[in-house]
């Protein structure tokens, strides 16, 4: 009887474990539709950026284009002075959005190290396209922003920036401080 009781208990625990695994795995959000929507949006926006880059008369901007990595940009003022390096500290004013218009961050005269920025910001700021004083908008593919993991609100279960999100940033570079790499 003891052997039968232990076998039944093991089976019961195994059933609970399998049921729990099924429940928790079904709680994981599926972002495949969001990913496809973001990639389609960015691809459609590419047509607009291509048109802006080829325009003979550029109203309200000085340059538009797409980097080899796929970052799309519209530069309203390219700035003056120094270009940022990967070891730089910058002071920026910015607004960040998702493609559906959801605001996901803003700051005025925010000090930040280049290493603490998403890869898309680092690439553009160090590209030579913009300098101190620049004012521009970038459209960053998800793989150069918060990637497949997104960015969750601290101590919460909801996403601040969902996985696979195209990241739109309106940026003004207030100041660049180039420091020597450590």
Go through each PLM region and give its residues.
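Bacterial N-terminal signal peptides that target proteins for export
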Residues: 2-14
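Cross-family detector of peptidyl-prolyl cis-trans isomerase
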Residues: 2-5, 24-182
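Bacterial N-terminal signal peptides
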Residues: 15-23
